[in-house]
A protein has these predicted regions:
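Basic/polar, cationic surfaces and motifs that engage anionic cell-wall
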Residues: 1-14, 30, 97, 109-202
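Hydrophobic faces of well-ordered beta-strands that scaffold small-molecule active sites
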Residues: 38, 104, 153-155
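Short connector loops/turns at beta-strand edges and beta->alpha or beta->beta junctions
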Residues: 43, 102-104, 108-114
Length: 202
């Protein structure tokens, strides 16, 4: 599996809104990686292109980042595993113990049929088969590398209740795939399990 390294070089930036120094990622300290949290970018303009978001992360003045971006074009790593990306803050982690300091963030880069509407409730956010397949392979590889149990592979939604990744959240039907969103997540998790070294032991 080829992963393009596009590591964010400048950790800190000056927030133009308040003039304060802030960071794009942080340090884990003594915390061990124990979770993988799956997201989508929520950027209707990405249309499956991981490079666009990976490039933007290099300079944007936002306290938001992720370790990996999986797109139709390629897989990018933007934050080293040993560092904490800002993708799921602890103060919002009210459903399980996963958070930035103990998790790896994986963003699947979505497409949207109608980019004029940006609502998370829209049912036309979707992942291509390639993104799902490559994403499952990446998550399986990371889970095996860090000995992460299958039930510690979760959605952003499972941690905070935020509808992310939308193509895998909700009991409504996706307009593109025809699948119920929750079933899409179950199918993705099964792909991950089958791609692991010992699928029957996780």
């Amino acid at each position: 599996m080829e992963i393009i390294q596009k590591i964010i070089k400048e950790r800190t930036f000056i927030d133009p809104k308040d003039g304060k120094t802030k960071s794009r990622f942080g340090y884990r300290g003594h915390n061990q990686i124990a979770w993988i949290i799956v997201h989508y970018t929520g950027d209707y303009g990405s249309q499956g292109c991981a490079k666009k978001t990976a490039d933007a992360m290099q300079t944007w003045k936002r306290t938001v980042s992720t370790h990996y971006l999986v797109g139709d074009d390629a897989i990018y790593q933007t934050v080293k595993d040993k560092h904490a990306a800002w993708h799921c803050p602890y103060e919002k982690s009210n459903k399980c113990a996963a958070s930035n300091c103990v998790a790896i963030g994986v963003d699947l880069v979505e497409r949207k049929r109608n980019p004029r509407s940006h609502s998370v409730k829209d049912r036309d956010w979707y992942f291509t088969d390639k993104v799902i397949q490559d994403g499952a392979q990446l998550v399986a590889m990371l889970a095996d590398k860090y000995n992460i149990p299958q039930d510690h592979i979760v959605r952003h939604y499972d941690v905070t209740g935020k509808w992310c990744p939308r193509p895998f959240v909700g009991n409504d039907t996706n307009e593109i795939t025809g699948d119920i969103h929750e079933i899409g997540w179950a199918m993705f998790k099964e792909r991950v399990r089958l791609a692991r070294r010992c699928p029957d032991d996780v």
